[in-house]
C-alpha cells in the first residue's frame, strides 16, 4: 500500500461558528463531496423502492437503477474516497497482460475531517446492507427479477466496500486480525459487566 498526496480542496472549510448552529451541510469539511457520496446511493435505493410509481416498464426501471448504481460506483471509487478519507483503489494491466490492483492511502490523514470520514464509512456500510435486505425480501416474495436487480446493487456496493477496506489495511491478514481483536474486545467488555440482579415480583393480597 503506497501513500499519495492530494492537493485538491473541494467544498467549504468547517469553522467553529458553523458547528454550533446545529445540523447543516456546512458542518462538514467538504459538504459538496459528502452530498455526492450519498446522493446517487440514496437515489438508487429510492427508485428501487418506488419504481412502480414512475413507470410500469421493468426494462426502464432496470436501466434507471443500473445507471444510478453505475454513477454511485464511479463517484465513490474515483472521487469521494479520495477526497473524504484519503483512500484510493485502482488497477492497471501491464505489458504482459497481467492485472495489478493498487490500494493506497494518503500520508497525512489529519487533513480529512472526522465527520466526513464517519459519513463516508457509514454510507459505504449501509449501502450493501440495504441491498442485501432487498435481495432477501425479493427472494421471499418470489420476485426473482427484482432479486437480480438488488443483487447487482449489493455486488457493486460491496466491491467499493472491499476495495476501501483493503486500502485501510495493508493486506487481508491485517484486516482479519483487526476484526478478530474488535470482536474479542467486545466479548471481553460484555463479560466484565456486572450481572443484573433479578428481583422476584411481590404480590400483595
Curated annotation (Swiss-Prot):
What's a GO biological-process term for it?
A: protein secretion
- TM ranges are 45-65, 119-139, 144-164
Q: Which UniProt keywords apply?
A: Membrane, Transmembrane, Transmembrane helix
- Cite the InterPro entries for this sequence: TVP23-like
The keyword Transmembrane helix appears for this protein: yes
Query: One GO CC annotation, please?
Result: Golgi membrane
Q: Which domain of life is it from?
A: Eukaryota
Q: Which membrane topology term applies here?
A: Multi-pass membrane protein
Query: Where is this protein localized, as stated in its record?
Result: Membrane
Q: Which Pfam families match?
A: DUF846 (PF05832)
To which protein family does this belong? Belongs to the TVP23 family.
* Name of the protein in its database record: Uncharacterized Golgi apparatus membrane protein-like protein C34D4.4
Q: Which organism is it from?
A: Caenorhabditis elegans
Q: State the organism's lineage.
A: Eukaryota, Metazoa, Ecdysozoa, Nematoda, Chromadorea
Amino acid at each position: 500500500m503506497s501513500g499519495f498526496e492530494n492537493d485538491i480542496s473541494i467544498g467549504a472549510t468547517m469553522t467553529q461558528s458553523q458547528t454550533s448552529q446545529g445540523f447543516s451541510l456546512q458542518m462538514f469539511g467538504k459538504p459538496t463531496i459528502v452530498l455526492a457520496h450519498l446522493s446517487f446511493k440514496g437515489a438508487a435505493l429510492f427508485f428501487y423502492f418506488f419504481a412502480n410509481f414512475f413507470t410500469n416498464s421493468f426494462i426502464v426501471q432496470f436501466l434507471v437503477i443500473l445507471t444510478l448504481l453505475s454513477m454511485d460506483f464511479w463517484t465513490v471509487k474515483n472521487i469521494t474516497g479520495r477526497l473524504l478519507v484519503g483512500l484510493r483503489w485502482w488497477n492497471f494491466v501491464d505489458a504482459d497482460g497481467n492485472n495489478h490492483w493498487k490500494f493506497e492511502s494518503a500520508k497525512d490523514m489529519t487533513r480529512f475531517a472526522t465527520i466526513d470520514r464517519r459519513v463516508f464509512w457509514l454510507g459505504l456500510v449501509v449501502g450493501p446492507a440495504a441491498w442485501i435486505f432487498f435481495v432477501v425480501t425479493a427472494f421471499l416474495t418470489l420476485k426473482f427479477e427484482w432479486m437480480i436487480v438488488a443483487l447487482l446493487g449489493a455486488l457493486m456496493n460491496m466491491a467499493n466496500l472491499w476495495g476501501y477496506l483493503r486500502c485501510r489495511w495493508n493486506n487481508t491478514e491485517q484486516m482479519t486480525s483487526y476484526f478478530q481483536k474488535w470482536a474479542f474486545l467486545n466479548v471481553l467488555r460484555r463479560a466484565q459487566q456486572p450481572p443484573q440482579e433479578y428481583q422476584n415480583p411481590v404480590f400483595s393480597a
